[in-house]
Amino acid sequence: VRIRDIHYPDTEKSIDLRLDSKAVRLDVYIEDDAGTVYNIEMQTTKGRDGELPRRTRYYQCMIDMDLLDKGVYYDDLRQTYIIFICTFDLFGRDERIYTFRHRCIELPELELGDGATKIFLNAKGLRGRVDRDLEDFLKFVDGQKAQSELAQEMEQEVERVKRQDEMRREYMTLYMEYQKQHRAGI
């Protein structure tokens, strides 16, 4: 996947289409070179029964409405992936990855082809084949030691951000002390 653009407006992308509807704040919103949209969400709590699957439905609707201008044909809707990275097994089946697309109940091999895919990654899962980087990423999310280059880069980035936050706190403490001394005329 070649990424064209990653949006981090104020950490989350907001979609607020109507005054009388609920707004959506997306954790990470990515568009690749083919125009495919990826919405990636981190989930540490299950919420009420059925909440997360229904939230993917709502996010899908809001993303589609945001992408589809008035007068544009429906076949211009882009492929979208809504990905929930979960620190728990939402479905209780011990799979590492659960991928959902709309299928015909009477003919399960018949896919609707609406371009919408929902993926739930399970950091606790042990079943199902995934590539090494994804396996290590899920271990990383679960707080386990991961060996891949990607996981090591993520760990280094987390440490860098932690150091940056510590430096920011130290700077603010020094600055506040300076302000206090300045006011006291020292």
Located regions from the model:
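Elongated, amphipathic alpha-helical interaction scaffolds
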Residues: 1-184
